[in-house]
């Protein structure tokens, strides 16, 4: 007499998302759920950090044993941990809270993910850590230019300096992420719809303006990847130029300004901002990106065939239509 045994299925892997209430986190939750991933929401602890160097951040993280233990319990049974928490304040001033959210928290999460036996931890960093470098890449070279970008660079440095465990840690440098419901995108649409919409020269420079759709797809690809993922990966370029971004967002062709005039205006602006404690650095950087954009070097995504479908122009057009 033959007997059959029901096929056993391995349980679906669980992904934990910290910062799920924010713009990126909530978009990730929707994208992961659509992809069939079981998502666990984990509340990120609010931390403050006194230190402004990686060794100091590591020492502060080591002292937070209770926080680490509590977080590890919440991450039990999780395969992939994604940190979308933090303070997204490009124009904000330096503070213990900023360093706590963007530098100390990632280390505490990485330690807790190790304790919980997670396979991979993806920390959402920012391409802003490379500041005015002419070429964005996946190297450890950073040139932060503001309190926000310094705090994100500090987070990357602290993760790189911590003793590695069994959980693979990756900092994912998101570029200028846009979404139809994001306030930053609404501001871009407003500017692009006015005579202030302008580019330097012919406007053919690559723009790192990107879509939240592509970012979520990239996070999913990195999390599911069965091989090793580098310590730093860069969100891929979506093929936009400075002119095409403004045209999609504003529905009109931008004004073309002389390159020398744009550079002179930025030099003067940064000089004044420096005298004001970098108060205008964030705004000036947005103008600089609008005029000149920033090139990106192909990296892990291109090498492994994990480049998501570009959606930036569609996202900007959708934002314009709902404005």
Residues covered by each model-derived region:
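Conserved beta-loop-beta element that borders a ligand/cofactor-binding pocket
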Residues: 156-180
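Conserved Rossmann-fold NAD(P)-dependent oxidoreductase catalytic core, especially the SDR/UDP-sugar
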Residues: 107-147
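NAD(P)H-binding glycine-rich loop region in Rossmannoid oxidoreductase-like domains
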Residues: 58-104, 112
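A hydrophobic C-terminal alpha-helical subdomain
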Residues: 261-307
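Substrate-positioning beta->alpha
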Residues: 183-187, 201-223, 230
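N-terminal Rossmann NAD(P)H-binding glycine-rich loop of SDR-like oxidoreductase domains
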Residues: 15-35
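Mid/C-terminal beta-alpha module of Rossmann-like enzyme folds, strongest
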Residues: 221-279, 310-323
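Amphipathic terminal alpha-helices
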Residues: 2-4, 292-323
């Amino acid at each position: 007499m033959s007997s059959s045994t029901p096929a056993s299925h391995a349980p679906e892997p669980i992904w934990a998302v910290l910062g799920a209430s924010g713009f990126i986190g909530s978009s990730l939750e929707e994208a992961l759920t659509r992809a069939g991933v079981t998502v666990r929401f984990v509340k990120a602890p609010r931390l403050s950090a006194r230190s402004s160097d990686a060794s100091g951040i590591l020492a502060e993280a080591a002292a937070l044993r209770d926080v680490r233990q509590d977080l590890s319990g919440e991450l039990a049974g999780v395969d992939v941990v994604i940190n979308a928490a933090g303070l997204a304040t490009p124009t904000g001033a330096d503070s213990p809270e900023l360093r706590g959210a963007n530098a100390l928290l990632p280390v505490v999460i990485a330690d807790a993910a190790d304790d919980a036996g997670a396979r991979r931890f993806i920390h959402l960093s920012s391409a802003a850590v490379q500041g005015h470098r002419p070429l964005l890449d996946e190297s450890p070279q950073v040139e932060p230019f503001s309190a926000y970008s310094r705090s994100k660079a500090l987070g990357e440095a602290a993760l790189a300096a911590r003793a590695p465990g069994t959980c693979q840690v990756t900092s994912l440098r998101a570029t200028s992420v846009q979404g139809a419901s994001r306030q930053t995108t609404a501001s871009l649409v407003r500017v692009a719809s006015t005579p202030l919409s302008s580019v330097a020269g012919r406007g053919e420079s690559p723009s790192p303006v990107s879509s939240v759709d592509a970012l979520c797809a990239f996070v999913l690809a990195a999390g599911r990847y069965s091989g090793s993922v580098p310590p730093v990966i860069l969100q891929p370029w979506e093929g936009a130029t400075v002119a095409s971004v403004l045209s999609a967002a504003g529905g009109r062709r931008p004004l073309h300004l002389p390159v020398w005039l744009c550079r002179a205006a930025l030099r003067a602006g940064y000089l004044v901002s420096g005298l004001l404690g970098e108060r205008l650095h964030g705004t000036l950087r947005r103008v600089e990106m609008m005029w000149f954009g920033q090139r990106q070097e192909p990296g892990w995504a291109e090498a492994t065939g994990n480049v998501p479908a570009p959606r930036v122009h569609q996202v900007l057009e959708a934002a314009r239509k709902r404005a």
